[in-house]
Amino acid sequence: MARRRDGKMCGKFTQMSSRQEVHAFSQPLVITKDADEVVVSTPMRTANIMRLSAAGEREMVPMRWGFAGHDDPNPSRPKHMHVRAETIDQRRTFAQAFATSRGILIVHTFNEGEELPNGKTKQWVVTPNDDLPIAIAVIFEEWHNGPETLLTFVMVTTPPNALIARITDRMPAILPREAWPAWLDETDASLAEAKALLQTYEDGGNWMMAPQQSSKPSPSPGAPKQKPQGELF
């Protein structure tokens, strides 16, 4: 198989957990009034991110995907979508957000793209067999332009595990449940300890990967309704 070597994440269609699902899965959690259901999220669009509030409570907050430059008057053209775990505390663009503004994006599935010899990209859907949501590490910051403000986030990436390495050289930084408190800054973890959480996630055979279907068949009458999907990677 041809593999991408640029270290950039690619792919389409991941399924966001609904607000109710995230609330049930992530207790204790406060749902803010602005955290509406998000079923589709693409770069430059919005997703709900879990973070720690000023009161020290977990909350879901809508944020736009992608960091724009601080001097860019238009945040709809972000310069960064992802950040490498290896250099997250070293690059000026990301170091402050890593130190003070860490969050979690919760999804059901995610896609990775395999670059083919003909220049096209083949999409693969990664799905956990146990059907439990996947927690992806993100960092966020507030973009300013005069009185206008906007919360934005980027996803953290790591080297791939054995499954993902078949098609690409990066994958999302997945956080096991026990890592959430330190990543969300609920504990006294140091920055070195927070960075140490960003390891390649070994799925232990729990994930399956299948080609993304190019089209969806029409559901038969009475068939269970499919959960909506959106683009994340």
Stretches found by the model and what they are:
Residues 1-233:
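Short linear sequence motif anchored by a di-proline
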